[in-house]
Design a protein with these regions (language model features):
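Cap/insert and terminal regions of metallo-dependent hydrolase folds
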Residues: 180-261
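Binuclear metal-dependent hydrolase catalytic cores
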Residues: 1-175, 184, 241-261
Length: 261
Protein backbone atom coordinates (compact mmCIF):
# COMPACT_ATOMS: atom_id res chain seq x y z
CA UNK A 1 0.00 0.00 0.00
CA UNK A 2 1.30 3.45 -0.97
CA UNK A 3 2.03 5.92 1.82
CA UNK A 4 1.85 9.16 -0.16
CA UNK A 5 -1.10 11.52 0.03
CA UNK A 6 -3.54 11.82 -2.82
CA UNK A 7 -5.84 14.61 -3.93
CA UNK A 8 -8.33 13.66 -6.62
CA UNK A 9 -10.50 16.24 -8.38
CA UNK A 10 -13.34 15.11 -10.62
CA UNK A 11 -13.20 17.68 -13.40
CA UNK A 12 -16.18 16.10 -15.11
CA UNK A 13 -18.41 13.08 -14.55
CA UNK A 14 -20.75 13.14 -17.52
CA UNK A 15 -21.25 11.01 -20.58
CA UNK A 16 -20.20 12.02 -24.10
CA UNK A 17 -22.87 14.73 -24.47
CA UNK A 18 -22.79 15.90 -20.86
CA UNK A 19 -25.81 16.58 -18.67
CA UNK A 20 -27.98 18.28 -19.70
CA UNK A 21 -27.70 17.65 -23.41
CA UNK A 22 -28.81 20.41 -25.76
CA UNK A 23 -32.58 20.72 -25.82
CA UNK A 24 -33.17 18.38 -22.88
CA UNK A 25 -36.47 18.76 -21.01
CA UNK A 26 -36.33 15.73 -18.71
CA UNK A 27 -36.52 16.29 -14.92
CA UNK A 28 -32.86 15.43 -14.24
CA UNK A 29 -31.64 17.85 -16.89
CA UNK A 30 -33.86 20.58 -15.41
CA UNK A 31 -32.72 19.84 -11.84
CA UNK A 32 -31.50 22.76 -9.72
CA UNK A 33 -29.02 20.50 -7.89
CA UNK A 34 -25.53 21.30 -9.24
CA UNK A 35 -24.59 17.65 -8.70
CA UNK A 36 -26.97 16.79 -11.55
CA UNK A 37 -24.99 18.97 -14.00
CA UNK A 38 -22.18 17.01 -15.60
CA UNK A 39 -19.38 18.06 -17.94
CA UNK A 40 -17.46 15.44 -19.89
CA UNK A 41 -15.52 12.94 -17.78
CA UNK A 42 -11.97 13.66 -16.68
CA UNK A 43 -10.01 13.41 -13.45
CA UNK A 44 -7.07 15.41 -12.06
CA UNK A 45 -4.70 13.60 -9.70
CA UNK A 46 -2.19 15.22 -7.35
CA UNK A 47 0.21 12.57 -6.09
CA UNK A 48 3.89 12.54 -5.14
CA UNK A 49 4.13 16.24 -6.03
CA UNK A 50 2.96 15.47 -9.59
CA UNK A 51 -0.17 16.66 -11.33
CA UNK A 52 -1.72 14.06 -13.62
CA UNK A 53 -4.68 14.44 -15.97
CA UNK A 54 -6.66 11.44 -17.20
CA UNK A 55 -8.50 12.34 -20.41
CA UNK A 56 -8.95 15.79 -21.91
CA UNK A 57 -12.41 16.38 -23.32
CA UNK A 58 -14.24 19.37 -24.82
CA UNK A 59 -14.86 20.95 -21.40
CA UNK A 60 -11.19 20.90 -20.33
CA UNK A 61 -10.70 24.68 -20.39
CA UNK A 62 -13.87 25.33 -18.38
CA UNK A 63 -12.96 22.63 -15.87
CA UNK A 64 -9.43 23.91 -15.26
CA UNK A 65 -10.66 27.48 -14.81
CA UNK A 66 -13.42 26.37 -12.44
CA UNK A 67 -10.91 24.54 -10.23
CA UNK A 68 -8.23 27.24 -10.51
CA UNK A 69 -5.72 24.73 -11.90
CA UNK A 70 -2.91 25.76 -14.23
CA UNK A 71 -0.38 22.95 -14.40
CA UNK A 72 -0.20 19.34 -15.57
CA UNK A 73 2.92 17.18 -15.47
CA UNK A 74 1.56 14.58 -17.88
CA UNK A 75 -1.65 13.31 -19.46
CA UNK A 76 -2.94 9.74 -19.65
CA UNK A 77 -5.54 9.00 -22.34
CA UNK A 78 -7.94 6.09 -22.00
CA UNK A 79 -9.06 6.02 -25.64
CA UNK A 80 -9.56 8.18 -28.71
CA UNK A 81 -13.25 9.09 -28.58
CA UNK A 82 -13.92 12.80 -28.98
CA UNK A 83 -15.15 13.35 -25.44
CA UNK A 84 -11.79 12.10 -24.13
CA UNK A 85 -9.24 13.88 -26.35
CA UNK A 86 -10.70 16.88 -28.15
CA UNK A 87 -9.67 19.36 -25.45
CA UNK A 88 -5.97 18.80 -26.04
CA UNK A 89 -5.61 22.03 -28.01
CA UNK A 90 -6.26 23.90 -24.76
CA UNK A 91 -3.01 22.71 -23.19
CA UNK A 92 -1.37 25.66 -24.97
CA UNK A 93 -1.53 28.00 -21.96
CA UNK A 94 0.23 25.34 -19.90
CA UNK A 95 2.91 25.07 -22.60
CA UNK A 96 3.47 28.82 -22.29
CA UNK A 97 3.16 29.20 -18.52
CA UNK A 98 5.58 26.42 -17.73
CA UNK A 99 7.73 26.48 -20.88
CA UNK A 100 7.36 22.78 -21.61
CA UNK A 101 5.89 20.36 -24.09
CA UNK A 102 3.01 18.31 -22.71
CA UNK A 103 3.81 14.60 -22.25
CA UNK A 104 0.89 12.41 -23.37
CA UNK A 105 0.75 8.63 -22.82
CA UNK A 106 -1.68 6.35 -24.63
CA UNK A 107 -2.05 3.27 -26.78
CA UNK A 108 -0.41 3.63 -30.24
CA UNK A 109 -3.85 3.74 -31.87
CA UNK A 110 -4.81 6.64 -29.62
CA UNK A 111 -1.56 8.50 -30.26
CA UNK A 112 -2.26 8.21 -33.99
CA UNK A 113 -5.74 9.62 -33.40
CA UNK A 114 -4.23 12.63 -31.62
CA UNK A 115 -2.04 13.26 -34.67
CA UNK A 116 -5.06 12.94 -36.95
CA UNK A 117 -7.25 15.29 -34.88
CA UNK A 118 -4.55 17.93 -34.38
CA UNK A 119 -2.42 17.75 -37.55
CA UNK A 120 -1.44 21.42 -37.27
CA UNK A 121 0.46 20.62 -34.06
CA UNK A 122 2.83 18.37 -35.97
CA UNK A 123 3.76 20.48 -38.99
CA UNK A 124 7.52 20.47 -39.62
CA UNK A 125 8.03 24.22 -39.17
CA UNK A 126 7.56 26.42 -36.14
CA UNK A 127 4.37 28.45 -36.03
CA UNK A 128 3.46 30.73 -33.12
CA UNK A 129 0.62 29.53 -30.94
CA UNK A 130 0.68 25.82 -31.69
CA UNK A 131 0.15 23.32 -28.87
CA UNK A 132 3.27 21.34 -28.10
CA UNK A 133 2.99 17.65 -27.29
CA UNK A 134 5.51 15.00 -26.31
CA UNK A 135 3.83 11.77 -27.41
CA UNK A 136 4.54 8.40 -25.80
CA UNK A 137 3.16 5.11 -27.09
CA UNK A 138 2.17 2.54 -24.48
CA UNK A 139 3.38 -0.40 -26.54
CA UNK A 140 3.28 -3.08 -23.87
CA UNK A 141 0.25 -2.90 -21.61
CA UNK A 142 1.68 -5.66 -19.42
CA UNK A 143 4.49 -3.42 -18.19
CA UNK A 144 4.18 -0.64 -15.66
CA UNK A 145 5.31 2.83 -16.67
CA UNK A 146 7.52 4.99 -14.49
CA UNK A 147 7.01 8.69 -15.14
CA UNK A 148 8.89 11.18 -12.97
CA UNK A 149 9.12 8.58 -10.17
CA UNK A 150 5.38 7.85 -10.37
CA UNK A 151 4.45 4.25 -11.19
CA UNK A 152 1.54 3.96 -13.61
CA UNK A 153 -0.06 0.58 -14.25
CA UNK A 154 -2.00 0.37 -17.55
CA UNK A 155 -5.25 -1.55 -17.14
CA UNK A 156 -6.51 -3.19 -20.36
CA UNK A 157 -10.31 -3.13 -20.44
CA UNK A 158 -13.00 -3.14 -23.13
CA UNK A 159 -15.36 -0.38 -24.22
CA UNK A 160 -17.74 -2.65 -26.09
CA UNK A 161 -15.38 -4.40 -28.50
CA UNK A 162 -12.84 -1.57 -28.41
CA UNK A 163 -9.70 -2.25 -26.34
CA UNK A 164 -9.03 0.77 -24.13
CA UNK A 165 -7.04 1.50 -20.99
CA UNK A 166 -7.83 2.29 -17.41
CA UNK A 167 -4.99 3.34 -15.13
CA UNK A 168 -3.81 2.53 -11.64
CA UNK A 169 -1.79 5.17 -9.80
CA UNK A 170 -0.76 3.80 -6.42
CA UNK A 171 -3.91 3.00 -4.45
CA UNK A 172 -6.19 4.74 -6.96
CA UNK A 173 -7.63 3.27 -10.17
CA UNK A 174 -9.75 4.81 -12.93
CA UNK A 175 -11.94 2.69 -15.22
CA UNK A 176 -14.15 4.89 -17.37
CA UNK A 177 -16.17 3.78 -20.42
CA UNK A 178 -15.77 0.18 -19.31
CA UNK A 179 -17.98 -2.70 -20.42
CA UNK A 180 -15.71 -5.65 -19.62
CA UNK A 181 -12.72 -6.15 -17.33
CA UNK A 182 -10.54 -9.17 -18.17
CA UNK A 183 -9.55 -11.44 -15.30
CA UNK A 184 -5.89 -10.55 -15.86
CA UNK A 185 -6.75 -6.90 -15.28
CA UNK A 186 -8.79 -7.65 -12.17
CA UNK A 187 -5.63 -9.18 -10.71
CA UNK A 188 -4.06 -5.70 -10.93
CA UNK A 189 -6.91 -4.12 -8.99
CA UNK A 190 -6.47 -5.56 -5.52
CA UNK A 191 -5.80 -3.50 -2.40
CA UNK A 192 -7.23 -0.24 -3.73
CA UNK A 193 -8.29 2.63 -1.53
CA UNK A 194 -10.37 4.20 -4.30
CA UNK A 195 -11.62 2.89 -7.63
CA UNK A 196 -13.59 4.93 -10.16
CA UNK A 197 -15.89 2.96 -12.47
CA UNK A 198 -17.97 4.16 -15.39
CA UNK A 199 -21.72 3.65 -14.86
CA UNK A 200 -23.84 5.10 -17.65
CA UNK A 201 -27.37 4.75 -16.32
CA UNK A 202 -29.70 2.42 -14.43
CA UNK A 203 -31.26 0.77 -17.50
CA UNK A 204 -31.53 -0.48 -20.18
CA UNK A 205 -28.31 -2.40 -20.71
CA UNK A 206 -25.76 -0.81 -23.04
CA UNK A 207 -23.42 -2.54 -25.49
CA UNK A 208 -20.31 -0.53 -24.57
CA UNK A 209 -20.88 0.77 -21.03
CA UNK A 210 -21.72 -0.79 -17.70
CA UNK A 211 -25.04 0.22 -16.20
CA UNK A 212 -25.31 0.88 -12.48
CA UNK A 213 -26.21 -2.67 -11.38
CA UNK A 214 -23.26 -4.06 -13.34
CA UNK A 215 -20.90 -1.40 -11.99
CA UNK A 216 -21.99 -2.21 -8.44
CA UNK A 217 -21.31 -5.89 -9.10
CA UNK A 218 -17.83 -5.07 -10.39
CA UNK A 219 -17.20 -2.79 -7.41
CA UNK A 220 -18.15 -5.56 -5.01
CA UNK A 221 -15.75 -7.91 -6.77
CA UNK A 222 -12.85 -5.44 -6.70
CA UNK A 223 -13.56 -4.59 -3.03
CA UNK A 224 -11.82 -1.23 -2.93
CA UNK A 225 -12.27 0.74 0.28
CA UNK A 226 -14.38 3.28 -1.64
CA UNK A 227 -15.92 3.25 -5.12
CA UNK A 228 -17.05 6.24 -7.17
CA UNK A 229 -19.12 6.02 -10.34
CA UNK A 230 -18.55 8.36 -13.29
CA UNK A 231 -19.41 8.88 -16.99
CA UNK A 232 -23.05 9.30 -15.98
CA UNK A 233 -26.00 10.23 -18.22
CA UNK A 234 -29.29 11.90 -17.32
CA UNK A 235 -30.85 8.43 -17.42
CA UNK A 236 -29.15 7.60 -14.12
CA UNK A 237 -31.68 9.73 -12.26
CA UNK A 238 -31.29 12.41 -9.62
CA UNK A 239 -27.97 12.39 -7.75
CA UNK A 240 -29.59 12.61 -4.31
CA UNK A 241 -32.04 9.77 -4.91
CA UNK A 242 -29.51 7.40 -6.47
CA UNK A 243 -26.89 8.11 -3.80
CA UNK A 244 -29.36 7.14 -1.08
CA UNK A 245 -29.85 3.75 -2.76
CA UNK A 246 -26.15 2.85 -2.94
CA UNK A 247 -24.16 0.73 -0.48
CA UNK A 248 -22.21 2.77 2.12
CA UNK A 249 -18.85 2.43 0.32
CA UNK A 250 -20.20 3.39 -3.12
CA UNK A 251 -20.91 6.88 -4.41
CA UNK A 252 -21.97 8.78 -7.49
CA UNK A 253 -19.16 11.17 -8.33
CA UNK A 254 -20.10 14.70 -9.35
CA UNK A 255 -18.29 17.58 -11.00
CA UNK A 256 -15.92 19.34 -8.63
CA UNK A 257 -15.88 16.51 -6.08
CA UNK A 258 -12.52 16.31 -4.30
CA UNK A 259 -11.10 13.32 -2.48
CA UNK A 260 -8.12 13.31 -0.13
CA UNK A 261 -6.62 10.12 1.24
Amino acid sequence: MEDSNYKITFLGTGTSQGVPIIGAKDPVSLSSDPRDKRLRSSVYIEYKEKKILIDCGPDFRTQMLRENLDDIDFILLTHEHTDHIIGLDDVRPINYLHNKDMPIYALPRVINAVKDRFPYAFIPHEYPGLPKYELHNIENTEEEINIDKVKIIPLPIFHGKLPILGYRVGDFAYLTDVREVPETTKELLTGLKVVVIGALRKKPLHHSHLVLSQAIELAEELAAEQTYFTHISYEMGFYKEVQEELPPTMHLAYDGLKLKF
